[in-house]
């Protein structure tokens, strides 16, 4: 039985999140040899070259407006998002960043309403958002950490979520060009790579070439560059085209879930009751927020209760 285009979009989003949720393991290994900005630059260089090798077709320049959208997407989704998130990690706890960045679906829904004139998010969306954020909080704090606010770092993490929302909206606008999304993703990477160059001088870029070819580092760089960047961004951008930015962004809720499960499987970290409860709550939040999944409303429950109470004995 063949998948419908919509079902394929959901499957693609899920597979992308499964890969993105495990990238922290590779990043953790690479941080022993490289700085965050070095990992970022090498990762997207490999990503761009991978797309160029597999899809060498040239994407012609058509309109200045198109190039501005590509540049905006590269600046937001490639350069600023990762840089702001990394800077936030130096000013606040990683657990805080994990929760704040998960607000991206909320910002995406609001921007889609204001910018794309889509339907205003309703009570069901906010209920799902609340459940997912509560679940993510249980996962990242894991019953061991008390919330400790750090205004600068927390604001930067929220800014990173907003930046990703901007990227999602720009990606949807780019999808409207009706061009090959892989080629569009490559053009986005190109601009993101260009915008990243000034940051290299700001944060320092002095990678040791020999360390890049150590087998463990090479494996993780290729995983991040080819798998988590070239493949996942191309698939994610196609998913935004199929499902729309809001519905696609909801899958971001699952990143902490995949992270905690992969930690248990790969790093043998203990899966606590708080993490299990958080996983269930996060999944519930995703299902509640999913508009196309019909859940029984108040009238349905009233009707069922009425039938039960009026049933003859």
Segments predicted by a language model, with ranges:
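Glycine-/small-residue-enriched transmembrane alpha-helix faces in small-molecule transporters
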Residues: 1-38, 75, 147-173, 195, ...
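C-terminal-most transmembrane helix of multi-pass membrane proteins
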Residues: 2-3, 11, 42-44, 253-313
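Hydrophobic alpha-helical transmembrane segments of multi-pass integral membrane proteins
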Residues: 8-12, 38-53, 72, 125-134, ...
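Specific alpha-helical transmembrane segments that line the substrate/conduction pathway
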Residues: 38-49, 77, 86-124, 160, ...
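Hydrophobic transmembrane alpha-helices of multi-pass small-molecule transport proteins
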Residues: 51, 71, 111, 121-143, ...
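Specific transmembrane alpha-helical segments of multi-pass solute transporters/efflux pumps
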Residues: 19, 23-24, 52-101, 111, ...
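Helix-loop interface residues and adjacent transmembrane-helix termini in multi-pass membrane transporters
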Residues: 33, 91, 118, 177-178, ...
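Membrane-interface helix termini and inter-helical loops of multi-pass transporters
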Residues: 25-33, 89-90, 140-152, 202-216, ...
